Amino acid sequence: PAYTIIGANGKERNTTLRDAKKEGLVPSVTTVLNIVAKPSLENWKINKALEASIELQQGEDEPNEEFIYRCKTAQRDIGQSAAAQGTKIHALIERGFEGKSNNKSYRAVKKFLDKHFPNEEWIAEDSFCSELGYGGKIDLYSKSGIFVDFKTKDGLEGKDPAKLVFDEHGMQLSAYAQGCGFDSPQRVSVFVDREQTDLALGHIWDEDSHIKHVEMFNSLLTYWKLVKNYDSSTL
């Protein structure tokens, strides 16, 4: 994956669409999915900003604009902290499946997978590039066609994993499977609690929804190519 590139000034920076067109790079599955609004995520951001407005006190002479900015900054800091914790947990699970660590997040995920898919050989954080013009890095999969994606979330205790998933989660897994040449994959979304990191809940997607999710993703991929005026599959 080419998430970053060395710029003209010799410093590393995020890869842009202009870089992709110049170098013949493909968008990731996540990049394609990000073209669609995520109401649940936006609602979470709004809630955090509102919570910040309650906790923070507006100065007597503080203009509304400055107070709003402080609330937005507090919300952004919370989001960045949650993302950082998610990245840390992902790394721990990856190291576990690579045989480099026996941490509790890995054990919780492995316990769920062993229960439903015993005796599988798992491959962690592997990349692919599809001739359809997209690519990605898969959290975990097996050569038998089981694709697993990890998400981190707060307050998982007592939750029903079936109520935690959205179509975008299924689309992501289906896009990975399609990119790796699997027509009838098994797809699994695993949620790990950000605080209680030994708590993992898994949802196994029904096979029938794979066709729908592939079509949904491919429609978004076509839309992305048209909006960005870039189709790497024709290069």
What are these regions (language model features)?
Residues 122-230:
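Mg2+/Mn2+-dependent nuclease catalytic core
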Residues 235:
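Acidic, carboxylate-rich catalytic segments that either coordinate divalent cations
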Residues 1-135:
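Metal-dependent nuclease catalytic cores that hydrolyze phosphodiester bonds in DNA/RNA
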Residues 101, 229-232:
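Residue-level signal for secondary-structure boundary elements
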